[in-house]
Amino acid sequence: MLQDILPHVYHSEYRNKTPEDTDIMIFQKGRELLLASDGSYSLPTVGQIRKICPETIKDSFYLFSVDEQGFYSVPDQVLEALPLPLTGPVFGKTTFSWQSVMALRETEHEWHAFGGAVGWHLANWYSLHRFCGKCGTETVHSETERAIVCPNCGHIWYPRISPVVIIAIVDGDRILLTRYNRNGYRRHALVAGFVEIGESFEEAVRREVMEEVGLRVKNIRYIESQPWPFSSSLIAGFSADVDGDPTVHLNTDGGEELAEAVWVDRETLTIEDTSVSLTWDMIRQFKDGVLSPSP
């Protein structure tokens, strides 16, 4: 999956350190990242940016490290000084331009995709907290931890992670596959949704399944989890057996998330996507017989 980057090691702890030329720069704008346009989706280095715009590096701030390679970003206002797209002798034959962060799902360089996605998550969070949500004062970065501090009222913000459940609903040798209605992902998926305030994971599983496909489930079992930076989420994967009638009733209240939900036999199940996501890792487990209904 996306986070499986061995032998590389992700270091999430905050470090107040100076960027080196071999470190990586994360430039984000909304849902876009500055990525190589050659299909590798690589990211520019500190050394490259230092040669064309040294002031940018002076304003950079630390995000995290993969092995000993640091990832850094810059405040939104600093982006205006960059001569975009990034091209020329400093970058060799590579041009860096704005591309969807979701492009990182398609690269074969796992640790680089992970670093870019997590970097986007954190850089986007910093961007959204430039001003205090309590008093409106411009915030500053903590020098001792990964946090945003208001110098006026003293309020402290930490990066947000939204909990999500994803459910492999099983009925004997069948699994329920869904297709989203509007989010741009056209391959099949599993029922999933955000956990509401005051809910347990298990309660969220039951609610999401009932809301989206009108089924009752039992034997809810935890499978595994995955950080999913693209939606600032931590996903908990579960399997569950149908409890009673397996007839699907799609939500049609006008805010429906799913375009379809179909039962697919294990023998005819086709793997449509890579195992970068927990969704397809769980579907593959069902295909291989690892994930089965409770006896």
Give residue spans per PLM region.
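N-terminal strand-loop-strand
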Residues: T144-L190, F194, R216-V217, A240-V242
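Short functional micro-motifs and their immediate structural scaffolds
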Residues: T137-V140, Y158
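Unchanged
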Residues: T56-E106, V195-P293
